[in-house]
Every structure is written in C-alpha cells, then in structure tokens.
C-alpha cells in the first residue's frame, strides 16, 4: 500500500504545504491513520480516493494548526509559503512554474485542494467529490474561483514584469 501510493500522496501533500519535511510528516500521519482505519474500509469508494481524502484532510488540518499557531494574517501566511517555495532546493521550475506555485499559495486551503486535485491530478469532479465530501456543483464553483484567482495573479505578475 505504501509503495504503491506514497509518491502520489506525497506530491499531493507537497502541493498543499510546499515544504518537503511538512509533506513527509503529513504522509507519515496519513499512513498511520490508514493503517488504523484499514480494517473498517468498506470499499464504498475507490482505495485511492479514500487515501486522497485522508491526505487532503491531514494537509488541511496541518495548515489550520500552522496558521493558528503563527497568528499570521492569511496574506502573511501565503507569503511564508511563497518564500518556502522559492528557497526549496527541490524546486527547479522556470518563471511560469514559480508564478503558478506562488498563485496557488495565495488560495485558501480548501480552494487550493480542489485546484490541485482538478488541475494537477486531473481528477473528475465526481472523484473530487468522493475525496472531499463536497457536492459537484460546489466543486465546479470553487475550481472556477480558484482558476480565476490563479489566472489574475499570474497576469498581474506578468504586467509588473514588463
């Protein structure tokens, strides 16, 4: 189970929190929860959607705790995430990728989760609904708002870089 899914789960957590060590902690906690809950897995959803839900929830919980502990405004916290991304030795992206990741860092955590699952993981809204427990209609609206925010952020950066 760990060998099969750990890399995909790691990258989902990593896109949520941007920090390698934080993502590893989330994955470790997630797989502990999976191990404890596996006997109760009924198979109502696909295994990977169940795993994604656990990782997404762990990521959101982590972000809430980090935000609450730091007592930073959302904007300050987003800036902290951007700074972590820029300083990350594993990030070797170009300016466009950096702008995209910075834009994603400005999204509220739940919107970020929806955006990542749809844009990067290319999941269908029905699958995202299984993972998040959010209706398909709400997901479409959330993704649309996230997409517009990301697009406007990148256009704003492009305007100021000319």
Positions of PLM-derived features:
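C-terminal edge and immediately downstream basic/flexible tail or linker adjoining helix-turn-helix-like DNA-binding
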Residues: 18, 70-73, 99-101, 106, ...
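Arg/Lys-rich amphipathic alpha helix in sigma70-family domain 2
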Residues: 40-42, 53-73
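Short, charged helix-capping/linker segments at alpha-helix termini
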Residues: 10-29, 136, 157-162
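Amphipathic, Lys/Arg- and hydrophobic-enriched alpha-helical face
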Residues: 2-20, 37, 104, 153-156
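A short pre-motif secondary-structure segment
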Residues: 114-118
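Structural recognition of an alpha-helix C-terminal capping motif at a helix-to-coil junction
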Residues: 11, 25-32, 45-57
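Sigma70-family region 2
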Residues: 15-18, 31-46, 65-67
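Internal acidic/polar
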Residues: 69-93
